[in-house]
Curated annotation (Swiss-Prot):
The lineage of its organism: Eukaryota, Amoebozoa, Evosea, Eumycetozoa, Dictyostelia. One of its GO terms (molecular function) is GTP binding. Residues 497-517 have a biased composition (Low complexity). Keywords: GTP-binding, Mitochondrion, Nucleotide-binding. It is found in: Mitochondrion matrix. It comes from Dictyostelium discoideum. Gene3D superfamilies: Tubulin/FtsZ, C-terminal domain, Tubulin/FtsZ, GTPase domain. It holds the Pfam family FtsZ_C. Coiled coil: none annotated. This is Mitochondrial division protein fszA.
Amino acid sequence: MSQFMIRYQIINLSKVFNSPKSLNFIKRYTTSTASTTTTTTNDDSNWISTPNITVCGIGGGGCNSVNNMINKELYGIDFVVANTDAQALAISCSRKMVQLGKTLTRGLGAGAVPEVGKKATEESIEELMNQIGDTQMLFVTAGMGGGTGTGGAAVIASAAKAKGILTVGIVTKPFHFEGKHRMKLAEQGLIELEKSVDSLIVIPNEKLMEQSQELYIGNAFQMVDDVLYNSIRGISDILVKPGLINLDFADVRSIMCNSGKALMGVGEGEGKGRDAIAANIALNNPLLENINISGAKGVLLNIAGSDLKLQEVDHIVSLVSSKVDPSANIIFGSTFDQQLEGKIRVTLIVTGMDQLIQQQQQQQKQTKIESQVEQKLHSTTIVDQELKPIEPQKSIIIEEEQEEQQQPKPIIPGIFVEQELLTTTTTANITPSQQKQESLTQNNIFSPPQQQQQQPSINLQPNYQQLYQQLYQQQQQQLQQQQPISFLKRLSNLFFTNGNNNKPYNNNKNTPGSNYE
């Protein structure tokens, strides 16, 4: 009876202490074998065979996410925070904290310079690794784009991986409104972090806005912290939390060790068909960045609920298996969560996506370029269609000019009209026999067309062509200068001027300076 009461007290106390080490400490001093266990080694594996999992938050974003996890009582996790800003560490909820770069930054922060954050982390890396301790799995969380998190996350990850710790990076990319410079720093930091971790999960903050576009700025950052919380919880629960189906740490290590970039999706469903709803939401989650996961090589699946049925678990696993490579390594676990109250939550971690992500990004760039080219072509066709109605006006003007050319030119005193010149030249050259033959052919309407003589073509003389061309050029120049001059005045200036002194002709014999003198 006494042993039963002791175990009942242990179960109640386990709800207060969230880490396995604290639970083992209680068991060591409350069981009947306490006298013997106090003299044994400090190896806790004899009591609870659960892996030690640690979350390290670095920088302002990482410290905020750790505070959110502690406030939500994430089960079975140790927390460590590190920052160059002493004021941010003072309000942290974590018991383990490290001030980075005490001599370099003096607790004043990195000033959004990743190089300063990197050097500050290298200065305090030994103290930080002592706080992390002998853990089997380390989550490095940070908000990329600043100074401390962007520069120091890769330093912590490389030091942990060198000790044989399974290192997973879960970081965020900034919103668009935070600026292009911050986004550029984040992308550079992601390149360095990817080289230092076993698996990297990147959460783009901009994708979260697609779920709800009417968010206040404070709620938006809270939603980012909740996504980080759910991603770590989806992995840690199947290792340390009791449930229907628990996984070994070796299974998780086989999926996430040296797996490169990974993607995450979370979905919840309730009511009829809740299993299919939760699975489809997780598979079509915006955090998957619209990337086809059919070529994924590893899948980690966590199914949580308060009243799960075996048939629902089987249906969810079959739906996820149909979307990935048939040869993919799929491991799944099922845990109890009384807070869901009739809901099912599916957490999906897809690994081995490096090549698929690169191919998808190249295709997206290519489609973006093609769409830009199509838009330019569409805009040019619209401009052409707007300019096409001008062409009939041009043709009308040309037809009017041709009609004016066909009409007889006005007779101006002092010069010969081209028609008179042409008629005199043609009649002078035709003999009387040719005139008689021409009249016969014109009167004979039944004569074949081959025997009919063609009318002589009327061609302007070169002198008149030059004059008309000069008139046209002067007219265009004067229209541009907006100085209208009458047509007759221009003709008089051209035809009635003296070639020597450019004076007008004087036809009056009695006046001095006339051309008849």
